[in-house]
């Protein structure tokens, strides 16, 4: 190909690319995930391993039990990428963790501990931002933790407990920030609106209790004796051979009936205005 012809082709290609514009170029990339869980899982991988002393320092600082130091600032700064991924994930509507809840009491929930770690980092970073006068960013991190609590969901009781814990921790930091920030009517109006939006869609225990009832009814069967022993031992209860020998259908039937009435009573209480 002659040099001048090659130049004309190159020039035409450049003009065509400029005509498309940057928006068209971006469309060449695959779309970002629309499932928050996938982004959270990436944030987990970005968590930097810490020594026990560093973990304790960050946790205590996030709760307002320790003053900000250069060491804490540096430690939290290592989580910049994990924080950004968490903030992005918290803004997404859909969050499906892909849990194998059909395994019942054997289902693993490894994401819960990781979410607690992420939330501690976010709340620690919120306090750092507040110390630097970046109040909007500080509140945004607290709101992100509250949204993470929503994403934890209400599939099982332990999930609801973790969600409540995260929400409570975020509220504690928000309260501390409100007590320290300068007067800012616009900021308060924005925060009030954000909190109202989050409060409009609360987690509920209805589906959670039904799931727990179903799992318990299926698990408390003679053929699941070994699983039951494993569950009790996992809670720190030692089962003696004599106790194992006493586990029969009659005993389990009484326990199923007791548990069923127990769950029903809780549902009645929760449904009472």
Predicted stretch roles:
Residues 2, 7-9, 16-273:
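Short acidic linear motifs
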